[in-house]
Amino acid sequence: MKDFKKLFKLQWKKNAIWLILLIIGSLLINTLTFKSYTNDIYRGLTNSVESFEESLDIKKDKRIKKPKEIDKSYIEYGDKLRDKLVEKYGIIPNEELMSMETDEIDKYYAKDRSMEFNTIDSKVANYDVRRDQLLNSNSENNLFSQYTNFFIFPFLFILAMLLTSIEQMTNYFDFTRMYPWSKTKDFAMKLVFGLLLTLVVYLLHIGIEQVMMKTSGLAKLYTSSGLARFFVKELILYWIFFVIFISTGAMSGNVFGHFGLNIIAFGLFELSVFDISTIQTVLNGLDYGPTIMTGFNEFLAKQEGVLLYFLSPLRDFNLSNEMLIAHGIIAALVFILAYFIVKHMKTENSGYMVINRPLKIISQTLASLTLTALIFNIVTSTFVDYNVYIGIVLYLFLLFVSYKLFKALFNIKIKV
């Protein structure tokens, strides 16, 4: 505990200005974004109701004025107008379409529709979306869960960089080797420090969002019931991402390596499949048929559980238990790898993109193959006719250039 207090003081003295700016920046951006989010729902509902009144030719003296705060009676009024339009134009609402068979949906959309019908259909759909955002009582899909605070992810990544990759780029890192605790303990304490700071910042975000909600035009219909579970799951997600960010940072000697290892951590399987698929294309031609990429995508399309999010972590991003478990497994694997690399790291490797030689070889190889595959696919997309021999020569040339490029980058030591 004493060592943790010492590390906390050292990190705060070293990064206080950056941490304060980072926290204020994340709070400010999230505040503005959340305000825009609530205003969008308010305007969407009130504008939809006004458009319903116009479409039904309701006299102005019988229309309801736009309220400062939307209440239950206003929603009931909007529902009544919406139902009249649905009946008048024979519109099938989205929630009913979702339960229909594909053939029935195709028949519905195959009918000739007037411009007026399409306009009303769009108005009804917009109203339903906003109404659902405000009134859906499902704890997994309520007002707050419709809003994901993506701006906390840059905060987590920059915080991880300050504690790891940026520190390794400075001469201060050499001084840290004189700390009266081991390298692995230093890594573990930084992880705890970051998790606690993430908790504090997240609670500040929630507090500000709650105050803004209570003072918005949605206050009368807003309920906080069922939000505790959502907030806990969201916090777990942020903690998982921070573990990944700080673990990749601990294995990186500079910020460029930090970015690269995160790309590998989240895209290892997809990048590998892409590279192998490109090699298949090089050898067999552009029109050869299904590649390993095709098979991989078809396999993922059939998956719904943990395996889907493990193989493709950022696909269909949500807060499902399956996604949290998959990301948790990735975080645990990356953390274990980082722990052993930190345990055996040499101070003189700080400043390089990757501080461990075996990991450096793997990363450099994957980076070279991926860049080659990317450029090859871009270039060959302009070809009218593809010749296998020309394709092989082009691929080998691009691979040679990519290898030389990344070999140079991985051997550059950055110290400030």
Each model region followed by its residue ranges:
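Aromatic- and glycine-rich beta-strand/loop motifs that create alpha-glucan
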Residues: 1-23
